[in-house]
From Swiss-Prot:
Keywords: Cytoplasm, Methyltransferase, rRNA processing, S-adenosyl-L-methionine, Transferase. The keyword Amino-acid biosynthesis does not apply. GO terms for cellular component: cytoplasm. PANTHER family: 12S RRNA N4-METHYLCYTIDINE METHYLTRANSFERASE, S-ADENOSYL-METHYLTRANSFERASE MRAW. The gene is rsmH. Its EC number is 2.1.1.199. Pfam families: Methyltransf_5. It catalyses: cytidine(1402) in 16S rRNA + S-adenosyl-L-methionine = N(4)-methylcytidine(1402) in 16S rRNA + S-adenosyl-L-homocysteine + H(+). InterPro entries: RsmH, SAM-dep_MeTrfase_MraW_recog, SAM-dependent_MTases_sf. The keyword rRNA processing applies. This is Ribosomal RNA small subunit methyltransferase H. It comes from Escherichia coli O127:H6 (strain E2348/69 / EPEC). One of its GO terms (biological process) is rRNA base methylation.
Amino acid sequence: MMENYKHTTVLLDEAVNGLNIRPDGIYIDGTFGRGGHSRLILSQLGEEGRLLAIDRDPQAIAVAKTIDDPRFSIIHGPFSALGEYVAERDLIGKIDGILLDLGVSSPQLDDAERGFSFMRDGPLDMRMDPTRGQSAAEWLQTAEEADIAWVLKTYGEERFAKRIARAIVERNREQPMTRTKELAEVVAAATPVKDKFKHPATRTFQAVRIWVNSELEEIEQALKSSLNVLASGGRLSIISFHSLEDRIVKRFMRENSRGPQVPAGLPMTEEQLKKLGGRQLRALGKLMPGEEEVAENPRARSSVLRIAERTNA
């Protein structure tokens, strides 16, 4: 059954404007979600333009299939495989822009049955594609205590990672957790110091979700592929929602906006320097939501939009 949860697209105009849409261009929306970005891109494309959308959430795919437009196509899969999708369509080096809206969507958070939220009791799942891979409950029941602690520390930046991991393992030995409420209660009980502005389970839920969905690896692979598929002058427009995501995007754009790093004093000919290649991207800066958008949609508060352009190198 299709859910009817409202989804307000964050930095909608800014992210699409960052693509610098050409009416006859070919674009990728790597995170279709509920189609906010895709619909705006389509409204700016001419008859010859094309939009390829990607999402691994079956509910997003169902929404995408309601778009009756010959310029639009949808792929059910992870955006990390965008290089494969582009190669299959013989479009390597022909993509004029890629948009990624990272992290979990509002409909996923608001639907208790998806298991993403500690605020709503539901199955402890957290998979963006519930048809593939281990659920959060399955992973927590089989993982070693040290591995759980590492995930909480690395992906949640949780200061009490070891205590929480121990509590999770002990609880699962007594009776396996299958509900989000159970995990939230275990985490709260294991947290010795409470933050009055943040639920004690916030970081744990973020960390487990990122691990279950391989979110950071997905981002890194998609960014790497983007250099191969983008046309000269093609744009990357990427919205991040927490520091772990933004760090990856920022580092990627910075590293690929530099020319070849040659030690001072190393004798090299012009020909040798050419072979090393020049910079592959030109970083065009970052944007953050204004006060009005944050007031209307509090989830936009932590978002950061970064834009870069593919160079000729």
